[in-house]
């Protein structure tokens, strides 16, 4: 008997695991809140916020990662911010899982 696997949509992303979808919903709420607090008229503050968020691994699902990417692209457009000052976004633990050997 073949059971259909459930799917969960969050912010345009499709998840097959409920746990990941729940995490993505939490991250979506966090992103909404952060968007009200991050002042894009102050790139230095955006850079500090962005780097701290990356260092603390606040986001682990595509929902949060896409927000970080949006901030990263914004920062790269600021002429006086060095590219080397903008941390890369880690994705090794996407969905909160370690990469597993097959």
What feature does the model see in each segment?
Residues 1-102:
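Intrinsically disordered, low-complexity linkers and terminal regions
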């Amino acid at each position: 008997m073949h059971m259909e696997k459930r799917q969960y949509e969050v912010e345009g992303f499709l998840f097959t695991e409920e746990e990941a979808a729940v995490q993505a919903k939490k991250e979506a709420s966090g992103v909404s809140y952060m968007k009200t607090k991050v002042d894009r008229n102050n790139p230095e503050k955006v850079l500090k916020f962005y780097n701290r968020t990356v260092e603390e691994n606040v986001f682990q699902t595509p929902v949060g990662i896409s927000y970080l990417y949006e901030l990263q692209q914004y920062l790269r457009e600021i002429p006086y911010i060095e590219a080397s000052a903008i941390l890369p976004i880690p994705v090794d633990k996407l969905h909160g899982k370690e990469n597993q050997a097959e």
